[in-house]
């Protein structure tokens, strides 16, 4: 089982192989997540977000993602579409260009590749 630090190292190594720099942020506080999203404007090329339970009800995170208008990938380690009915609804999805669910930790690497391709194609 991977720790959060292990996951960050894994993602950083895989992104490095692609020549991509990544930074990380984790919080259980909705406002802190929103602040981090807002701080990405003009500084980051894209956002990969696993919003956890906020996925299902945080219209504030949706609004923040829409406001910064960066290429965004929604990632879930488990397949949220195969879980309880309430987990199948993502209120943040309209602000995301891609949703990757059920691929475990590899989903983060898939998201990096997807966003890199979109950024390359659309500038």
List where the protein language model places each region.
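Glycine-rich phosphate/diphosphate-binding loop of Rossmann-like nucleotide-binding domains
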Residues: 1-18
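Structural motif
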Residues: 25-38
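Helix C-cap/helix->beta junction micro-motif
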Residues: 18, 44, 68-71
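Short acidic/histidine-rich motifs immediately flanking catalytic phosphotransfer sites
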Residues: 40-47
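Short Gly/Thr/Asp-enriched flexible loops that form oxyanion-binding sites at enzyme active sites
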Residues: 39, 58-67
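Short glycine-rich anion-binding loops that position phosphate/pyrophosphate groups of nucleotides
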Residues: 52-55, 78-80
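Short, glycine-/small-residue-rich phosphate/pyrophosphate-handling segment
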Residues: 21-24, 73, 82-123
């Amino acid at each position: 089982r991977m720790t959060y630090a292990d996951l960050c190292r894994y993602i950083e190594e895989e992104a490095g192989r692609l020549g991509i720099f990544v930074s990380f942020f984790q919080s259980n506080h909705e406002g802190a997540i929103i602040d981090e999203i807002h701080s990405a404007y003009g500084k980051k090329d894209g956002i990969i977000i696993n919003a956890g339970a906020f996925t299902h009800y945080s219209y504030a995170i949706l609004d923040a993602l829409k406001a910064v208008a960066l290429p965004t990938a929604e990632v879930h380690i488990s397949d949220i579409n195969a879980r309880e009915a309430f987990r199948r609804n993502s209120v943040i999805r309209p602000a995301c260009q891609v949703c990757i669910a059920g691929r475990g930790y590899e989903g983060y690497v898939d998201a990096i590749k997807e966003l890199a391709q979109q950024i390359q194609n659309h500038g």
